[in-house]
């Protein structure tokens, strides 16, 4: 809390908001963030929203998800060059079911490989996953909406911004 108060004082001095990156591991600090920031924060959820979208793909198109997962594991070391994360490939299973998706190493791997997954190409230069991923999400827009809404609601509840 001491560090947070210092950063909040700097933000107050310059009229900034503190940026808080979401993550299920951070829910425990959200009540303090809400209180100490006096509501002056920006919650960044793009990475965890991506993971929720992948949860939809896993449910709606398991074959596509399995291909993306395999590619992510194969390219994990490449992705780690862009991020300072502690993902141990030894703790990333070769395949997962819905119950395994919340394992920290699995989530980190799928989080940091998003750029590689979206930009991967076939030998013919066509998108390897992007087109099928977007199609899957469009075809399951209602499920995606409910999933992301629930995810955001969890953050807002932890921040005390909406009631449980």
Predicted feature locations:
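Active-site capping/gating regions of soluble enzymes
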Residues: 1-163
């Amino acid at each position: 809390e001491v560090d947070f108060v210092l950063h909040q004082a700097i933000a107050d001095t310059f009229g900034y908001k503190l940026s808080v990156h979401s993550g299920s591991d951070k829910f425990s600090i959200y009540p303090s963030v809400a209180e100490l920031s006096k509501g002056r924060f920006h919650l960044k959820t793009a990475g965890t929203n991506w993971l929720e979208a992948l949860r939809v793909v896993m449910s709606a198109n398991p074959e596509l998800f399995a291909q993306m997962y395999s590619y992510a594991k194969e390219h994990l070391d490449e992705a780690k060059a862009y991020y300072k994360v502690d993902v141990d490939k030894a703790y990333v299973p070769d395949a997962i079911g819905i119950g395994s998706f919340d394992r920290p190493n699995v989530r980190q791997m799928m989080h940091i490989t998003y750029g590689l997954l979206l930009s991967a190409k076939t030998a013919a230069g066509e998108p390897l996953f992007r087109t099928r991923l977007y199609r899957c999400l469009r075809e399951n827009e209602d499920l995606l909406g409910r999933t992301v809404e629930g995810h955001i609601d969890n953050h807002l509840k932890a921040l005390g911004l909406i009631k449980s």
